[in-house]
Amino acid sequence: MIGRTLTATCTIQSVSADSDEATIGQIHGQSSVFMLLIYRPANHDVQVVTYTINGGSTATRATVVTGVNLGDTITYSIHYSGSVVTTVVNGVTNTYSVDSSWAGTPVYFKLGSYHAAPNTGNPAGDATKVSFSAFSVTP
């Protein structure tokens, strides 16, 4: 993927009590994650997490917007082109340089409701729930 943009509008209804964040968008390589867009309800913020080296476990986090509560609308776009990723979250734009280890790596966008809570042993109804009202991937 070279020069594509994921645009989405979502509302986060809940985040599992066993998790402290919910991933609402990402760029993923064939075997490793490249970039995550994460909502953290305790901090009322949205962060961008970028994995510095392809296949590595070192990541950097940057808070991109604050004051976001459960039930609020989050509108975002993630644009990846060449050696740059640009995010726009609720109107706030940030740009990130991409390490050369990602050059030529096939990647794809993912959106949804991903959380770090265990998949078993959770009380009934304890879930991360995100609704998307719009999304698109464009060149």
Predicted regions located by residue number:
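Short, surface-exposed beta-strand/loop "edge" segments at domain boundaries and coil↔beta transitions
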Residues: 30-36, 54-60, 95, 116-126
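Short hydrophobic/aromatic-rich beta-strand segments that constitute the beta-sheet cores
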Residues: 48-50, 87
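Short strand-turn-strand beta-turns centered on an Asx-Gly dipeptide
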Residues: 88-92
